[in-house]
Amino acid sequence: MSHDDMSNSSGFNEAAASFSWNGPKKAINPYLDPAEVAPESALSNLITLYAADNEQEQLRREALSEQVWERYFFNESRDPVQREMEQDKLISRAKLAHEQQRFNPDMVILADVNAQPSHISKPLMQRIEYFSSLGRPKAYSRYLRETIKPCLERLEHIRDSQLSTSFRFMASHEGLDGLLILPEMSQEQVKRLSTLVAAHMSMCLDAACGDLYATDDVKPEEIRKTWERVAAETLRLDVIPPAFEQLRRKRNRRKPVPYELIPGSLARMLCADWWYRKLWKMRCEWREEQLRAVCLVSKKASPYVSYEAVMHKREQRRKSLEFFRSHELVNEDGDTLDMEDVVNASSSNPAHRRNEMMACVKGLELIAEMRGDCAVFYTITCPSRFHSTLNNGRPNPTWTNATVRQSSDYLVGMFAAFRKAMHKAGLRWYGVRVAEPHHDGTVHWHLLCFMRKKDRRAITALLCKFAIREDREELGNNTGPRFKSELINPRKGTPTSYIAKYISKNIDGRGLAGEISKETGKSLRDNAEYVNAWASLHRVQQFRFFGIPGRQAYRELRLLAGQAARQQGDKKAGAPVLDNPRLDAILAAADAGCFATYIMKQGGVLVPRKYHLIRTAYEINEEPTAYGDHGIRIYGIWSPIAEGKICTHAVKWKMVRKAVDVQEAVADQGACAPWTRGNNCPLAENLNQQAKDKSADGDTRTDITRMDDKELHDYLHSMSKKERRELAARLRLVKPKRRKDYKQRITDHQRQQLVYELKSRGFDGSEKEVDLLLRGGSIPSGAGLRIFYRNQRLQEDDKWRNLY
């Protein structure tokens, strides 16, 4: 800058400073001079809060948008680049696993086990982990190759046999692909699937009808052709349509076609509830056969039937009891009967069922003594191709994927062929047959038969011939594994004593708590629950009498005798009830409970049914079922030597739900009682409060804590029955105190067995659970049950058992 410029600028500054309005202004800086900042107002604070809320909402929307974008666009199924990267990772991982499997074939078996459904893979992996924890690599590898691998191969064969070609074709329809995984489904899933199947059948019916019903002149044969179309679809699902035998085409039909059965049959095939029952039964059977294929039903795992099936049976029984307790029977006159009492008084009660069967066997024994017949005890077993598991828990190499039902059908067919040959040879017998399961669920029979002494050898030889004729080469000279016979010696025991144990252990195990099964190693009373679950699941008839009159007429006669006794009132006991003396003698024998007299008065043993004097009468039910048809029910009794029928079910009872009395529920403090501060207290507090109330009312109890032994003894013996009951009720509420240091002592081997059994039942088998059981605690196992460890055994209590 030149000198002239500097002089000019200085002159300008001096001129500007001479005027106040032209002076420099101070810069605005709120951080340096806060005193001049405008004060905050309520409006400014509100604006600030709104701005912060808007900022938070904007951040939330951006985060949500990123989540939606990542979920639906930036994933392996949407983004091609990421999908390709994930596929490369999976391919490299599969190549690595394949290379490892080339050097270690055991990993292939483990991968196959993990690929199975949970009801198969979980118990198998628990067993594999147990063998792996033993620290014996060779035994672990041998177990995988010799036990697990054959089990998986058998499982695939079972699945192929279950899923027939027609069944797979039905699963190819839209919405019915769940049929392929039917054993893996739960009840809710089966219900949804049954609805879809019923809808498919409805569409098949619409397609079959077409324009058939456009006119009124439809012939019955055309309707039957429509039924055949729907029935063919039902048969593809391996389900027999209702009334199939009566309505199917036959070459030599002797009777006219019952066209009246078509509406009820079609209504069932179009009903979702009917399909649910069929599919659920099929699901349970298929699932059980798959568990048998992998050796999970045996003496080493769960005898007779799987543990899952036992738990399902317990839950079903609990629901049935709740249903019986919540309903009652009402007749036209307004009389009511408690449904639980009616069920317990019928033959559904295991105790009554056992007593009736023992009385019948005793009657056969008395008749045999009177006739001079001998008694023989037979045992018949299926060939080895029906047995899935060996006694050591390993797969049976000769098993041909035969099911439990097929083993039962084999014995039924063999017995029918033998009976035909026996009658052709002029031989006769009578007795009772008991069906029992082996440890793997395969059926075998025990027979108590009475026959003439001169026919015993011929009948035994003929029965042995039919029992061992299939797969004869596997027996050699020893036919004992397939057929056994024992002549009952009266010196050792009566025929009733021989069969008593088999009847009891297949019903409720009464009187067999101390006996241990040689096949399973468990108490026969505990095995009874498993046997009942086995018979219910596979629909096996456990008991069958032959050669004697029917027992249903015996029950109807006893019912008639009870009704007559109530109507006679003050008349002389033993007065005749029926006009015909022969029929009245049969009724008197049934009323007295003497099966021997009842059988002989009916005509005796080995008499055809058409010659029995009293038979059961049936009638068509007046009220239609849910499917529009009328079923058949028991009417009473009838006799060919007397006119008319005698009704034993004249009163019509209707099942209704019980009405809940709120005041009574509050007094009983049951489940229906309203939740108040009174019934919500623990039992001990309620007891103490009741004691205080009674003390306030003047009811003073003697303090027994200050008495010595003699005074306490005299006081307890001087109490009335009511006071004793009250004291016993109070003592039940006092829980016994267990020592803090209490713990059962077991060996390491017993601890490993306990852990293994806990894992087999679906528990973790951790140290915490083991210590809890050893200290006397219990673990809930479902359906109101708890497991505990006592006497070196893992036991399970059942609070419903004493009701059955």
Curated annotation (Swiss-Prot):
Matches recorded under InterPro entries: Replication_gene_A-like (IPR008766)
What GO molecular function terms would the record report? endonuclease activity
Supply the EC number(s): 3.1.-.-
Q: Which biological process terms from the Gene Ontology are attached to this UniProt entry?
A: DNA replication
Q: Which domain of life is it from?
A: Bacteria
Q: Which residues form the active site?
A: Y498, Y502
User: Which keywords does this chain's UniProt record carry?
Assistant: DNA replication, Endonuclease, Hydrolase, Nuclease
Please report which protein family the annotation says this sequence is part of.
Answer: Belongs to the phage GPA family.
What does this protein do, in the record's words? Possible endonuclease which induces a single-strand cut and initiates DNA replication.
Protein name per the record: Probable replication endonuclease from prophage-like region
Q: Which organism is it from?
A: Escherichia coli O6:H1 (strain CFT073 / ATCC 700928 / UPEC)
